[in-house]
Each structure stands twice: as C-alpha cells, then as structure tokens.
Amino acid sequence: MDTNISKRFDDWLKSDSSAAALVMRQWLLPVEGKDTVIFPPTYAAPNEMSETEKRQWRQQTLGYNIDRLDGGATVCQIDSVGAQANRMEAIFKREPYKKLVPQVTITVGQTKVNLLDAGHRAADGVVRFSSLRDKFDAAFRSIKDNGDAEPLAKIAPTSIVFGCWDSQSTGVKLPRIVRSVIRAYEVDLLHRSAQYTPPVRYVSAGVIEVPEGVSDRILSKLGLRDTPASWTHGGVKLRPEKGEIRRDAVLNLAAIRALGTNEAGPDDEKTLKLRRYILGLALVAFTAPHDTNLREGCQLVPNAERPSKWELVRHDGQHEKFSLSHDEALKFAEDAAHDFVVGPDEDANFDQQYAKQQLAKSKEERKKEKRQRK
C-alpha cells in the first residue's frame, strides 16, 4: 500500500476542509444522432389523482416525467436518481471492484439475492427478514446512538455511498454521497400507434367458439383478435437548436466528513480511514465508465463535441477544475480499502418463520413495536 496515495485527499476529509463537493456534467447524444427519437421511462399516475385527473395526466405526459416551464421550455427525466444509483452500485459485483466491498448474499427459497441488488440496500426487507437482521440493526443503532458508521461500512458500505433510510426500525437516514441523474432539455413529445393482426381470423374461420360473456377485449388480450394500440407514448425528440441531454452528478464531500467512528476526535486516524474508504468507493463509482444503454429505444453515448466538465466546488462558491482518471480512483480505493480492512463476505438466509410472525401481527402491534425499536 502506498501511504501517499491513500492520504492524497485528506484535505477534503478533515473537519476544517473548505471542499463542498465534486460536480460533473456529461453531455450525451442518442446513439443514432441528435435528430433521432429516444424513449424515457414511463410512470404510473399518482394514486391520489382522481380517474379524470389520471386521464388528463396521461394525455399531457403519456406517462413520462416531463415538465413544461414558463416560456415553453421542457425538461424530461431520462434516468432517475434511483435508477442511476442502481446502475453505479452494480459495478461492485464484478471484477476488479468486487474485492472493495463485502459480498453479502441472502438465500430466499431457490433465489440468491446480492445485497447490491436490493433496492433499499441495508434497509431492504430482504435484510430485515434475514438471519443477518440483528447485525444490520446493530450497525444502524451504532450510527443513531454513537455516530459510529464503521459497523455499517464493514457490512454494507455502498448503503453509505448511495444512501438508505431504515424507516422500519431505527429511522436512520443516510443521504446519498454520490448522486446522479440524466435529463433531456428542450424536447418535443411524440406519439406512436401500432396494430397487431393475428395470422388467423380464429372466430370467423370457425377455429374457436367464443363462450358467452367473453368480450372482444379478452380475445385481444389472449392474442386471438386484432389489437390496436393508438396514440400511445412515442418518445421525445431534442429540439434542433437548444435541445440537449445531460448527466449531472455530485459527490458530496460534506456528507463524507459527517461520518464518524467511536473514537473521540473528529479527525482521528480511525475516522480518516473510514472516510478514505468511503471516498474511494464514491470516486470509483463517480469516475467509472457506465453503460448508457438505458432501455429499449434509449441508447446514449457521450457527445464527442462537448467534453465532460469536472469541478471541485468550495464552500465559498469557488469552482476549480478537477481531473482524476478512473485508474487513479481505483488505485486510491484499493489502498484505502486495504488500510480500512474490508468486512468479510456474508451468506444468510431469509427467515420465513420470522416473516410469518411479523405478518400475523396487527397493525397496532407493528406500530407499537416500531416505536419501541426507535
């Protein structure tokens, strides 16, 4: 281990640091070119809307998360903060990154779930109902009662990097240290229509007899009748002059400095080892080349004509150019992980009996138990 490398960013990690965050802007384009259509994710209408409001919402947005600003500008979400976090976190399942974090696997029936795939991370239900629940609960309580994040960093460090909320037990909230989102600016909304025609007219050909009460809609769902799909979501298209797709990412250095251990001093060596380790993981995720094949119809590539912009932002608002290659970030992370000592891999089982006991409790009993845990 190179001590100079592992301590390279200590000025960012000490309590009196003036560094607020690293910020990155990356401009992207559809793989086919700027003038082609891309498909954002679609979402269900909010539950609190009435049926009339839901219909109006679908007509206006087609299910996309798109905002219309004063003056006619539009902003469309292409990949959410949560989706980006899931994509970044997944790199720690593969080489050469997997050795940087403990690999925690929970067996649920015939399925093995890697903690890195759990949407709520250390606070996920797959953890709460596993044989590791007491260990995770103790780690969250260590943060809540003592401000000591080391136990959680030993078992689920990416839950610190990408954030989690232990809402069902201790109530501990960990903000995202790494936050990324992809948005498209100045886009026009498009529609599309489609028609499915079966290879055989099953009813008119006498191949099937339709029982009484079976509607044409049911036949369509079964693939036995024509199925039109008219005026549905057809993607978005960048406007020729101002349209752009941009990934905005932040690495919150202040959030790392808020991490402590059970040592007395705010900047003691044990605490700095923890902060270096978490910073190393964050830098690896922040600088790694990520797959931007987001979904069907939405494959993006970096805009070769607009290089990414990396800056270190100070608390006084000053912006400084910042440069760090992914190889440099990985080397720093490896040295910091060696110094911190990565926690061991864990294999656990989903506790069906415990889950059954919890499900059998009344709503009032669960609320009382939750209050007691907090």
Regions found by a protein language model. Name each.
Residues M1-C76, Y97, V104, V108-T111, ...:
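Basic polyanion-binding and macromolecular-assembly surfaces
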Residues C76-I78, N86:
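Active-site scaffold segments
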Residues Q84-R94:
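Short active-site loop/helix that positions an aromatic residue
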Residues M88, P102-V104:
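Surface-exposed cap/loop segments at beta↔alpha junctions
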Residues L115-D117, A123:
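Domain-exit/linker segments immediately C-terminal to small folded modules
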